[in-house]
Amino acid sequence: MTESEIVEDGRCRFDNEDLAQHRRTMRKSSDQTVADKPFHTPMLQAEPGQDILEGKKFFVVRGFMKSGTNWLCRLLNLHPDISCAGEFHWQNIAGPFVSNLDNSNLFNQKTGLRHEMWMRMDRMMKECMVLANHPDATWIGDRTPAHIAPSVVMDARIFNLIRDGRDVLVSRTYHFFNYPTVFPKFAEMPENKRRLREFKLDSHFFIKNPDELLGCTEFVEESAHYWAEAIELDDKATKDLPDERVLRVFYEDLHRDIAQQRKRLYEFLEVDPDQAAELSFNTEPGFEKEIPNRFLRKGAIGDWKNYMTPAAMDSFLKHAGDTMEQLGYET
């Protein structure tokens, strides 16, 4: 089989040449072990009786899916005092736990029991975060693309990442074409079935046929609705929290002035920005080459201009136009 032939990887088909280039890029620099340090360090080995939370502080990275939370996490990991890993999805555990507390007569009638139960749940989550992250870091983080509320990690500082909803839509659509089992309804939408077959055969199908990517009106409208709803919920949650707990970060600002934005990130956690490592190939804005069938595909701003037809734009703005305007995006 030659490199130009198409092979099957269990999700969709990809060009071997693209995959080989991706692997070469990932090997370019050992600096990737800095940005991804939770993966490259041994687990903390606690001594008997040791409190592994002692001296640790906590933060979370939140934002709608495909808003760049992975990149933000890697930027934070360039600082020796910070370690961020994902995705814990604590809300999926804490939500049912809190509901159980609320619905139990025992927890509500026995004075102080509900509070003590929640304190122990919070400690369990934080201990898991410490074990998953770099043992020498002071600031321990969880990167999960989710809403700010409920803020299940008590007293954690919050990075709220926001990205142009149109670029989110493009990235999200590519993501579901690459991983259709993540959202089965997507692959079952009649407009997407043919496109999925085409994409499996040629990973550059949408680059060659850009008007096809956002051709499913139902998915465009659903995505616009969910994105706008997430922004609204996060805005409300932010207003209910002290200013020092939340830092709003725009994806586009990271691209345009990454030096100043990195300074903001580190200063929010009260660490010295000058101690952070230099940017490397996997933390600089964007990628050297677009690889349509990779999780980290392009990392660009304004990519929606390549794919959004007038019909898709109308469908998107119908559900998210007001939110785009409130955030200051030109429409």
Descriptions of predicted regions:
Residues 268, 323-326:
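C-terminal alpha-helix
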Residues 145-276, 294-295:
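PAPS-dependent sulfotransferase catalytic domain
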Residues 127-149:
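Glycine-rich phosphate-binding loop used to anchor ATP phosphates in small-molecule kinases
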Residues 116-124, 140-143, 215, 219-230, ...:
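Soluble or luminal CAZymes and related metallo-dependent hydrolases
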Residues 1-130, 134, 174, 178-182, 189-207, 278-323, ...:
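PAPS-dependent sulfotransferase catalytic core
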Residues 86, 169-173, 308, 328:
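Short, flexible helix/strand-to-coil boundary loops that buttress conserved ligand/catalytic motifs
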